[in-house]
């Protein structure tokens, strides 16, 4: 696949594959954990999009500092009037320009190596007619939330997974188009 030119900053000339988006409302106290988990990613082929849903705390100031310091991945910030998490998701989807996207909540973190695993897996299945990928979620101690996937299950819809007895949170990575 030929690289798409998006823009040239001091560190990026190729369009990223993944947008990690984070809706946030008064989360200056939890966003550092999310940011640190993104800094630890071995693969930096992503953009972090923070949609601030009308925060009154120091979220904007904190993100501006990160934008000035961060050199390994792009951080985008959008402020909007408070309307609820669902409206922040809508704004995110209106502004995503990468092939894939995933939501990481403002009080969560991304597991080490997750970006690489997402992109490597996508490279293997991108030409199939998939809407995205489903992964397992874990708590901060690494315990899987709910049930894992049956060994025989290689593809499914999320609805069919739950109808077959699947349980727990799952991490959904969507094809943007």
PLM feature segments, named:
Residues 80-96:
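Glycine-rich, basic loop-to-helix element that forms the pyrophosphate-binding segment
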Residues 45-54, 76-81:
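Short beta-strand/loop segment that forms part of the nucleotide-sugar
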Residues 27-40:
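Short, well-formed alpha-helical segments that are part of the catalytic scaffolds
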Residues 37, 52-61:
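A conserved acidic beta->alpha catalytic loop
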Residues 16-19, 47:
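Cell-envelope/extracellular polymer assembly enzymes that use nucleotide-activated donors
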Residues 29-32, 57-66, 113:
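Acidic helix N-cap motif at the loop->helix transition within catalytic regions
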Residues 101:
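Short aromatic/hydrophobic "clamp" motif used to bind/position activated sugar donors
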Residues 113-146:
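Conserved donor NDP-sugar-binding/catalytic core segment of glycosyltransferases
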């Amino acid at each position: 696949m030929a690289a798409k030119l998006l823009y040239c900053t001091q560190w990026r000339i190729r369009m990223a594959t993944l947008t990690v988006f984070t809706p946030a409302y008064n989360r200056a106290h939890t966003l550092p954990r999310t940011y640190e988990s993104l800094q630890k990613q071995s693969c930096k082929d992503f953009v972090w999009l923070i949609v601030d849903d009308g925060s009154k705390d120091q979220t904007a100031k904190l993100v501006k500092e990160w934008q000035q310091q961060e050199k390994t991945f792009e951080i985008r910030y959008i402020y909007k009037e408070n309307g609820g998490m669902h409206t922040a998701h809508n704004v995110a989807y209106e502004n995503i320009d990468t092939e894939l996207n995933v939501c990481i909540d403002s009080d969560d973190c991304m597991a080490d190596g997750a970006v690489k695993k997402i992109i490597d897996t996508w490279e293997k299945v991108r030409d199939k007619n998939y809407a995205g990928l489903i992964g397992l979620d874990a708590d901060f101690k690494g315990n899987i939330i709910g049930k894992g996937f049956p060994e025989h299950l290689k593809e499914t819809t999320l609805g069919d997974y739950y109808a077959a007895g699947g349980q727990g949170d799952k991490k959904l990575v969507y094809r943007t188009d």
